[in-house]
Regions:
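The AdoMet/dcAdoMet-binding core of the Class I SAM-like
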Residues: 4, 27-160, 168-177, 181-183, ...
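Soluble small-group transferase modules, centered on the S-adenosyl donor enzyme superfamily
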Residues: 1-32, 38-46, 186-232
């Protein structure tokens, strides 16, 4: 779907949620995907942009997260896993998910957990955007799954997950937080304004929420910081 402003949206599951957004002149949208850019900066200060050196996306959809990371970190290798080949085709056709715009992105059409077990790499960031209510892939919510994620993270790695909720029902957010805390020392929660989404960020190292504020201040003060990252 495309609106009058030139925004294209990918709707799935009876149109209950927007899973990708694209605009020819805009990268960041102040929506859920932008919060994934903040995830590495929960690490201890100073954590700088050059310390983010790789990304894995489980639930690639049509590539909004990949496009943002490619714009901010143009040289880092990115792997994206998407179970639906039709969505990948739509991403290439309508959302610029191609080698010209994202030259470092490798796409795998496969189940996220299966493909994770086939990849022998570690990443700075693993982004999971595969929970698409009302269809939650429960095999991506277990202690065993998050243990597998942990083995694929670098020493200062983070995993960020988009979780759906309602204003009065945070049971899934709370349950996932408890599960992740069985594997990771710290889990942070960021509620996305004007949405029914919470981004959970788990860190390999013990961390505090104030790290994000301090790192953002450092990025803002650095003239070399990409404006997309500075404004996120």
């Amino acid at each position: 779907q495309e609106d009058q402003a030139g925004n294209r949206y990918l709707y799935l599951n009876e149109g209950q949620g927007i899973h990708s957004q694209w605009n020819p002149t805009q990268i960041a949208f102040r929506r859920t995907w932008d919060f994934f850019l903040s995830a590495p900066y929960f690490n201890a200060t100073p954590h700088t942009a050059d310390q983010v050196d790789s990304l894995l996306i489980i639930g690639l959809a049509a590539g909004t997260i990949a496009r943002q990371y490619s714009a901010v970190y143009p040289t880092i290798p990115m792997d994206g896993i998407e179970i639906d080949g039709g969505i990948v085709e739509a991403g290439a056709r309508y959302f610029d998910m191609n080698a010209d715009v994202m030259p470092t992105l490798t796409v795998y059409v496969e189940d996220g957990r299966y493909m994770l077990n086939q990849i022998n790499k570690q990443y700075s960031v693993i982004a999971i955007d595969a929970y698409r209510p009302p269809y939650i892939p429960w095999h991506l919510t277990t202690v065993e799954f998050f243990s597998e994620v942990r083995t694929h993270l670098s020493d200062d790695g983070v995993v960020a997950i988009n979780v759906g909720r309602t204003p009065s029902d945070r049971r899934l957010v709370d349950a996932l937080t408890a599960t992740m805390l069985e594997v990771f020392p710290t889990v942070h929660a960021m509620d996305v304004p004007e949405s029914f989404n919470t981004i959970l960020v788990a860190t390999v190292q013990p961390t505090i929420a104030d790290n994000l504020i301090r790192n953002r201040d450092g990025l803002a003060a650095n003239a070399q910081t990409n404006p997309i990252l500075r404004d996120t």
